């Protein structure tokens, strides 16, 4: 179950941040792409993301989550393909906004619908930690892949256009594979035994009853909950640094080193590999010691 979600996450992250590597050569064809325009385009993605994250997630909760993920995956793949045709600053902004709109509900659907449908509470931490490694893993393979594609001609397209279209094609294709491979619930999966289906369903129903007995939560109550707001603030402060690093590191490294774009793209894999190893260790250490707060605080402080 984790494998198809892991693949979807890798593809999504590659299509989200490939602009960082494409920016190494885009200025050769797009003279209007100044650092200010690049930064604005990178950031506009999150405007679409924020505006549609909650509404799209609520819609997904009322329909088939599996088919919803397949639909948005196909959509963002098409947007990435269209980015190969852009010639103006406005088109750059529009495509980045649309990409954010299409990807907005992916992770909320995975973390709040699909994983809870398949994993018991005691198993979810491991499932989520595996999913989180997909972000770093995609960066590890994304840099070298971008380095190769920036020097590759594909059906007459070269450089950043090759990068966009080649990394978009897997999203379009895997959307169909995901729709047939992934099942929304264990009871819909043929590879799950009847005994396992009964056990999982009973445990999840028990969990739901316990939740209802404690407190019935509306969406508006969740948005006003101080605990939710504190966690949102912590996450917000973390992602500022994470996305700043992801979008700007290739250009900063190129400026400081003078290396060609392909070498810069390959070199990004080094810090990402180190980050992946530390993340795996922290997850293991946190579970072994049954401690979470200081593991998070220490790594955020060091970062």
Question: Where would I find each of the regions flagged by the language model?
Answer:
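Extracytoplasmic
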Residues: 3-35, 142, 245-250
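Extracytoplasmic gate region of multi-pass secondary transporters
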Residues: 19-21, 220-279
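Helix-breaking motifs and short loop linkers at transmembrane-helix boundaries and internal kinks
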Residues: 32, 64, 85-91, 102, ...
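Conserved MFS/SLC helix-loop-helix module at the cytosolic interface between two early adjacent transmembrane helices
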Residues: 51-90
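Cytoplasmic membrane-interface "Motif A"-like loop-to-helix N-cap segments
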Residues: 61-73, 287-300
